[in-house]
Amino acid sequence: MIFQNVCRNESNFNAIASESRSQTQFGVSKSSSSGGGCISARTKDRHTKVNGRSRRVTMPALAAARIFQLTRELGHKTEGETIEWLLSQAEPSIIAATGYGTKLISNWVDVAADDSSSSSSMTSPQTQTQTPQSPSCRLDLCQPIGIQYPVNGYSHMPFTAMLLEPMTTTAESEVEIAEEEERRRRHH
């Protein structure tokens, strides 16, 4: 529901404002003008915009569900933190495919955020001279056939295999972990 300078009388304003509170990402304010109360929409994006674009990322439902699951499993506070982690793990593959990595892009976002807060013009991104840390695991897009990965052994699992892994509840995963540990004890 979008409101754009829709004038209403005082009794309708309260009904519309209470209805909009349950669905909003925008604020509703009443201004005094001739003809009664007037509702104006103020959209406010709570997130940092990258390079002035107000766009959202769309992704397949399976990928989004996997990001939510990884956020819980890795103990991250936000899905954005999980996506940053995934990008850092994929850095060598990104550099191989594009010729540059995400470090330069994240530095550009920092510069854009600083510039937007000071209202100055955008400057070119600064290059980062710090050497990147070697990743703890590599991004392997080809899943080897016939290899079974342990339930919580995500550090050595290819990314595509992680996406295809079904979501489990905490109780199910605890049972699976116990079963996996029991199998390891029998084999060793």
From Swiss-Prot:
It holds the Pfam family TCP. Residues 43-97 form the TCP domain. Residues 116-136 have a biased composition (Low complexity). GO terms for biological process: circadian rhythm; regulation of DNA-templated transcription. Keywords: DNA-binding, Nucleus, Transcription, Transcription regulation. One of its GO terms (molecular function) is DNA-binding transcription factor activity. The keyword NAD does not apply. It comes from the Eukaryota. Residues 44-53 have a biased composition (Basic residues). Transmembrane segments: none annotated. One of its GO terms (cellular component) is nucleus. It is found in: Nucleus. Disulfide bonds: none annotated. Residues 26-53, 115-136 are annotated as: Disordered. PANTHER family: TRANSCRIPTION FACTOR TCP11-RELATED, TRANSCRIPTION FACTOR TCP4-RELATED. Interacts with SPL. This is Transcription factor TCP11. It comes from Arabidopsis thaliana (Mouse-ear cress). The lineage of its organism: Eukaryota, Viridiplantae, Streptophyta, Embryophyta, Tracheophyta.
